[in-house]
Structure formats: structure tokens, C-alpha cells
Amino acid sequence: FWIDLRLPLHDNDTPAQCWAQFRVSLPAWSNETQHELIETLQLAPHLDKRLNMLSTGSRRKVGLVAALASGATVTLLDQPFVSLDQPSIRSLQAFLAQQGQNTDRAWLIADYEEPAHLPLVSVIQL
């Protein structure tokens, strides 16, 4: 799974339209995860707004919902905490910590430093 919502391709789409497009091509998509993350990442007030109307942090949250709900076997999260508010960072950390017990999916986090409060199986320094 790959997405970069900074690209202008999705500027005129709402979050719901983006997720509907991804859901079609992702058979393991989790509606339950999508709805849980909409709540915990506080995206409900933004569901009818076009992406080009959202802040950088809210736009990143839309992409994170897609990545986390995708059901992809391997998901790379490139600097997932950038531009997020503290409650969203804590929610994302809690979600990833919970998913760490799931052996059906692998999560790769690329970042400049190890995320605090998130147990990691392995760390590769480049």
C-alpha cells in the first residue's frame, strides 16, 4: 500500500471519497478500523471538506486512516507522527502497539528517532 496525499491528485476529494477509492482495490480493508480511527483522530468534523481545505496534520490523518485500515500485509509509515497533535500521536501509538500483537501484518516505521512509548521488535540504524 502506498499513498501520498500531499500530491494534488486528491485535492478536490473529501476524506470519504479518498477512502472509498482505496477500499475498492484493497480487499482486506477494515471498515471497523476506519471508523475507529475517524473517532480517535478527531476527523469527523472534516469528513465533508475537500483535502485542499484541510491542515497538513488533518491531511496526514486521512492518509494514516487509509494506511492503517488498508489491511495490507506490510505497511511502511514514513514519519507517521509529523504534523500531528499530541492526542493524535498518542492514539496512533496506542493503535500501533495494539497491532504489534497481530502477526498477520508488519509495520515498518521510518523516522529520525525511535518513537517514544511504542515497543519495537527491531530497530535498524542507517
Predicted regions and their residues:
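Conserved catalytic loops of ABC-family nucleotide-binding domains
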Residues: P87, F95-H117
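Hydrophobic anchor residue at the start of the ABC signature
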Residues: L64
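Conserved ABC ATPase signature
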Residues: R50-R59
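Conserved ABC ATPase "signature" region
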Residues: E32-H46
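Hydrophobic residue in the Walker B motif beta-strand
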Residues: T73-T75
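ABC ATPase nucleotide-binding domain signature region
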Residues: F1-V24, P115-A116
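ABC-family nucleotide-binding domains
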Residues: D78, L84-I89
